[in-house]
Structures are given as structure tokens and as C-alpha cells.
Amino acid sequence: MHRKDFLRLLALTPFVTHNMKLQAFSKITSSFSSTKKMPVLFTSHGNPMDIPLGLNANPFLTSLAQIGEKIRKEHEIKAILVVSAHWCTKGTLVNVSSAPDTIYDYYGFPPEYYTQKYLAPGSPETAKEVTKLIPKVKETTEWGLDHGAWPMLKHMFPKADVPVFEMSIDYYQSAQYHFDLAKQLKPLRDKGVLIIGSGAVVHNIKEAGKRFFNGNMKPYGWDIEFDQWIKQQLDKRDIQSIVNYEKNKLGLIAAPTPDHYVPLIYSLALMEKDESLEHTFEEMLPAFSNRGFKIG
């Protein structure tokens, strides 16, 4: 308990009578641990070529570092919750491990892709708060920090000194389901939890591969069009159109599978009415978007 909270509790003590229910008193004091409302992030975790790169090696990685520095200056971060495109499950799980492993969930890359470690501690106590807010979410310790988390976090918080845990994406549910579920995480923002949706507005592996592996990094055109459409909806705060992305003629081309798109929906579900939204980075590669933004 912070000193200021102790003093407030001390001041209340004379007013606690036998007739005052413990539950009511608990309700008063439950707000003492609240902190300044945390922002919410949506970010890409970069393309595979970014993984072995050091700090500030390109503009995208520099932007991640700048975001992390700014948030640490303005907020006291208790823990980070990452909703990663790389942890898809049947049902929704939350990792309550105290020491999450570094997961290399990619294949066929040079040795330097498999030697890096991001040894941030977990936050079991905070992770269990998720199951209290959303009882259908189940606990597990059989996961760690995957490609959607540590390659981004090692630039945003390079000291790995902020506790991190992940929540999975139920692959078999609709975009609207995820939007409604994510709303229930809002109380965590008042408890010092930085929530990050890590995915990509545009992520078509098949089409990206056709150009990436030939050294052609020029976008197709349709990828830019969809990415800009998303930006326009963000600026208009037309969140429902973003949730209903499959109705856009390019929606299922830009996101043929939901895994990388759904983290965007989680981040947007946490936005309050009239809350600010700042575009933090914008870059297009073939069939792949590095767009990111900060809410709050």
C-alpha cells in the first residue's frame, strides 16, 4: 500500500462502526490502488527481418523505443498485457506464469533468430485479475512470450524490467465477440496495466511472400488502400466499421485469417468515448502494414 493510501485509510478508521458492513468498507478502499489511467497501444511486431536487429536500427524500431520511453515518463506501469496474433487457441487463455519463456514460433531462419532472450518476469497476480473480470478466460502456465510480444517489447522496454503476460485469441470466434470480450478488460487500465494489441492491419502472408523473397518491397496498391481506409475510420471513430471489416471489399484480402487483425479490435474496444487517438507509426510493405496507434 502506498503511503498516501495508508493515510487515507487511517483517516477513515474512526468512521468504521460495527454496523458498517465489511463489504462496503472494502468498496471504499478498493480504489486506493488505482493509478492514472493507462494508455492502450496497437502496434505491429515487425516483419521477420526485424527480429535480429538492434535498438533504433530502422524507423519502425525507433518508434517503438520512443513510445516506451514516453509511457514510462508519464505512467507507473504495473504490468503489460499483450494480446498477440501469435497465440491463437480454442477458448481464451491467460498466462499466469511467473517466468514466461521466450518462444521462437517461426521456422527456417538463421541461428541468430533463436539465440535472443527477453527475460521479463510474468505477473501472475495481475493475470489472475483477467479471470475475475472474465470468468470464461482460463489460466495456463504453458505459454510464454511469443513472436507477437518479445520482438516488439525488446525495443519498447529493452531492460525487460516490466512484468508481462499474454492473453490468447479464440481463433473460432467472430470479430464482434472479441470486441465485446475486450471491453471487459477496461478496469485494468485503472490499475496500472498497459494493454497492447500486437498484430497488423494488413497481413497476407501468401501475397507478401511473393515479393519479400524476390527482394521487391513495393506494396501492391490494394494493401495501401485498405490500410488508409482503416486510418480514415480511426479518425472518424467509426469503430463498428473496423469490427465489420469483412464487409469491406478488401477486408478478406488484407486479413485472410483473423489472427493478426483481431488484436486491433481488442485495442479499440478499450477506448473510452472522446478519448484521444494518436497515430504512432505508418509504413507499408507488400501485403503488410506496420501501422500503430496510442489511445489515451
Predicted segments with their positions:
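N-terminal secretory signal peptides and thylakoid transit peptides that target proteins
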Residues: M1-P14, K21, K27
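A short aromatic-anchored loop/beta-hairpin motif
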Residues: F25-V137
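Beta-strand elements within well-structured catalytic alpha/beta cores of enzymes
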Residues: P39-S44, A79-S84, M167, L188-V201, ...
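A short secondary-structure junction signal
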Residues: L53, I169, A175-L181, K206-R211
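Long, well-ordered alpha-helical scaffolding segments within enzyme catalytic domains
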Residues: P59-K70, Q176-K191
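Short glycine-enriched loops at secondary-structure junctions
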Residues: A85-T89, A99-P100, L145-L153, V201
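Internal, conserved structured core segments that host functional sites
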Residues: P124-F179
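Surface-exposed, charge/polar-rich loops and edge strands
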Residues: V162-P163, Q173, P187-R189, L194, ...
